[in-house]
Curated annotation (Swiss-Prot):
Localization of this protein: Cytoplasm
Record: residues binding ATP: 273
Keywords: Aminoacyl-tRNA synthetase, ATP-binding, Cytoplasm, Ligase, Metal-binding, Nucleotide-binding, Protein biosynthesis, Zinc
GO MF annotations in UniProt: ATP binding; cysteine-tRNA ligase activity; zinc ion binding
Name this polypeptide is given: Cysteine--tRNA ligase
Cofactor(s) the protein requires to work: Zn(2+)
Enzyme class, broadest EC rank: ligase
Name of encoding gene: cysS
Organism: Prochlorococcus marinus (strain MIT 9303)
Record's cofactor remark: Binds 1 zinc ion per subunit.
Motif 'KMSKS' region boundaries: 270-274
Positions of Zn(2+) binding: 29, 213, 238, 242
Placement of sequence motif 'HIGH' region: 31-41
Pfam families xrefs: DALR_2, tRNA-synt_1e
Main location, first listed in the record: cytoplasm
Amino acid sequence: MSLRLTNTLTRRTEPFTPLKDGHVSIYCCGVTVYDLCHLGHARSYIAWDVLRRYLLWRGYSVTFVQNFTDIDDKILKRAAEKKCSMEHISEQNIEAFHQDMDALGILRPDRMPRATQCLDGIRALIGELETSGAAYSVDGDVYFAVMKHHGYGKLSGRDLNEQQQNADGRVADAEEARKQHSFDFALWKGAKTGEPSFPSPWGAGRPGWHIECSAMVREELGETIDIHLGGADLIFPHHENEIAQSEAATGKQLARYWLHNGMVNVGGQKMSKSLGNFTTIRALLESGVSPMTLRLFILQAHYRKPLDFTADAINAAATGWKGLNAALGLGNIYAEALNWPECKPLPQEVMQPAHSSTLEQCSEIRQHFIDALDDDLNSSGAIAVLFDLARPLRALANRLERGDTKAIQETAQLNLLPRWQLLVELANVLGLEAEKAAKLAPEGNNRVDENHIQLAIAARKEAKAARDFAKADRIRDELRAQGIELIDKPGGLTDWISS
């Protein structure tokens, strides 16, 4: 079986065939850099990191492009709040983004264009759309004429007649009268007093949100790409509008495969900054959740399905990772005692013509792993393979950690080295790597005073009820400094996790 992916555009799971044999072009919608990334971002970028790693492991060359939106209403609002420049907010959060992604072991994209660095391409694309009649200008603003694009709605499945006005939430009510149709969206926004602006044939202004990605895809990867990635919340309007703009300009298909990840939910609601129910990646890691625990938590659910963020789920992932980490670290820690001279991943070609029962088993295990990821990136199935592979390794590691030297002789006949090498190799495809053994904390230092936490949660709830949000934030920060991360849920309930 070859790799099969669920294509949002066709609503089918299809065999993946790249445009160019052996090479895959991928564009992933990046973040708007006005704040720190939350767990929803981690879910998206870990999922696509696994896609990229898997393609590379299977022998493809991959060009992976991911953008930064560094000019947007949210950035301008944050800059005004902080009394600093838009550039300062963008640079600060781009650096934070890199730090968070690096901490999670996410491979950096090959190229990361910024909207403000692609203005020539953006202006050129808007000009082409206006010349063809697909766009029109009104007093310094330029809009895309949705009704003139007959394929509009093919990605989201929406009918224009059923859509609400201002579906993208980015056009103010006062501007409605300027547009030919309420569904038309801005390609270029005329300059406003006090806001940064850039020159254009239509006057000073700045690009709309959707046109940025269309221009960057064309500039970095060409008119048609293999795979376009993003969260399910981007299907409409962002990706629908991308398709409309790009295909109206080029007459060619923008992307052959559209993949979308499901949302992270807290108490049945999507995690988002607008709802205030989000947890940043940084806060979660600072609370003591390890990067690999977070990866495992995210990958235990299929990328297209909703993912419920709960303390129990994080703690279960931490327990699972503890065992997997012990197995992965076996060859690093006990190589000399086990007389394993070559502690490197087993070459794939060795696995094919198996000459022993161990290698035959490894070959079968490898194929089970491939079958799982070929099935629309079934990461939970791939992780199940890792746990089965790790079981005897974890048992040996536990015995050695207890000082049981008999374990070496008793397991010698099992020939576990190829099994460990395969585990390291396959885990790396999922971005899971052994962590260094943590130093033991002094007696009593790692105990959690649950009564103290509950009292603090109650005090914070009272502060919020009294609208003393500064005090509520201070209590949260104090608990965070103690390694406790709070998780607010609907109905005024608060859960917590600890390191």
